[in-house]
Amino acid sequence: MEISIPSPADFHVHLRQGTLSELVTPHVRQGGFQLAYIMPNLKPPVTTTEQALAYKESLQKIDPNVEYLMTLYLSPSLTPEEIHKAAKAGIVGVKSYPRGVTTNSDGGIESYETYYPIFEAMQENDMVLNLHGEIPSDAEKNIHIINAEPSFLPHLLKLHKAFPKLRIVLEHATTRAAVEAVKSCGPTVACTITAHHLFLTVDDWAGQSFNYCKPVAKFPDDREALRAVIKEGIYDLFGAIHIDVKPLPGHPRFFLGSDSAPHPSHTKSTSTPDQGCAAGVYTSPVLLPLVAHVLESYGALGRLEDFVSTFGRKFYKRELAVETSAKKVTLKQVPEGFKIQESYDIASGENVVPFWAGKDIRWKIVEER
């Protein structure tokens, strides 16, 4: 069995910098993807148009065959004037990180009201606001990594109400509450879902650092909500599979954003009392086969093209032109299993361990045409 997908697009990926970037940037294409939406949390973060364009140029030098969509890091230095400049230069979005919540987020935000002039400028220029949907842990308020995402959702709803024409993406949702919140919003609010959050629950990362990411995977019921919103429309009202008719339309505001986040393996596998392991799961090298594998596992393979291409491209206004739609990536089912590589070597002498290293999946890429 083979499946061909037109121009898969990953709407949330970390391609890092230096020798690590040299390793992981080609993995976007290796994993089956032709468009990548690039996160700006470098050291220092990407806060100006010039920095974003320079970063894009560095990625293009590594692999010119991918379309890179660039973003800015929301910070106090950002101005409405810079937003107008960025939009004119083709920068697509601005990423918001709550302070200290995830990798390289020390310069993140503490109050959204401060940035309302920025959001107004973004709305005027039809840019996208990408939200890391968690609030920092606070023992006095009983906020922790499990409820950080649900606790953030009132901010999402408030922003949507204040800026109804601003396109907003709640990134890497992990909870049923997040799914329901996005569903309750209008057509300008969307949500990315990662491949690994379709696999994992809390039991999979507690004690296993290579599955640890931010936001953390939650409970089985939350995972079911993520899976269900992707599968939506495949089953009729009586629970029977539509075999002889085309599936009903799925939910167009939920699509893939891998949040593929590589870290040298020693930062994932070791920690000290004053330094925890790095948060991030690396899926880029096998992303499309991995998504096919997990969707097939719960009867949602028919949603693959919508999830990895159609829905995200439509929301980001990157629909395929007629001539582009011919560029397809073909997956082949491998009943005996296709083993995921154990690790990838960085030129610095370190290595990166991918998600599900050494395990078998049922799909592999056979060609691109």
Give the residues covered by each predicted segment:
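Active-site microenvironment of metallo-dependent hydrolases
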Residues: M1, I243-V245, A292-R369
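Short, acidic/polar
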Residues: G18-H27, S77-A86
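Histidine/acidic residue-rich metal-binding segments in metalloenzymes
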Residues: L78, E82-S96, T103-L256
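Short, electropositive alpha-helical surface patch
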Residues: A87, I143-P164, V182-I193, S265-P285, ...
